[in-house]
């Protein structure tokens, strides 16, 4: 069969998680390639990027079902860099998910489901 070995879907070496390439076709745009991720992370990052008013375009794609990576394209206004927008989106997501976890734990405490 032509499928890659199963371990390739999760084994990642040092420095291989993300690569950033400038998009030469569009001004103020970058392509972020994130290895060993899928639609779950791509969709949530894209949604967070689109909340930023200085982001003109944000989209993602999975090149092929057997390739375990996503490519996120970000275009911003002239006074804002795509890398800055991406970093801000990730930071905001981390804080939102931390708040969600905190609220979830608070709700479960009366039920004594958590230690």
Curated annotation (Swiss-Prot):
Lineage of the species this protein comes from: Eukaryota, Metazoa, Chordata, Craniata, Vertebrata
Pfam families: RNA_pol_L_2
Tissue: Ubiquitously expressed.
Transmembrane helix keyword on record: no
The name this protein goes by in its record: DNA-directed RNA polymerase II subunit RPB11-b1
Stated role: DNA-dependent RNA polymerase catalyzes the transcription of DNA into RNA using the four ribonucleoside triphosphates as substrates. Component of RNA polymerase II which synthesizes mRNA precursors and many functional non-coding RNAs. Pol II is the central component of the basal RNA polymerase II transcription machinery. It is composed of mobile elements that move relative to each other. RPB11 is part of the core element with the central large cleft.
SUPFAM superfamilies named in the record: RBP11-like subunits of RNA polymerase (SSF55257)
Organism of provenance: Homo sapiens (Human)
Keywords: DNA-directed RNA polymerase, Nucleus, Transcription
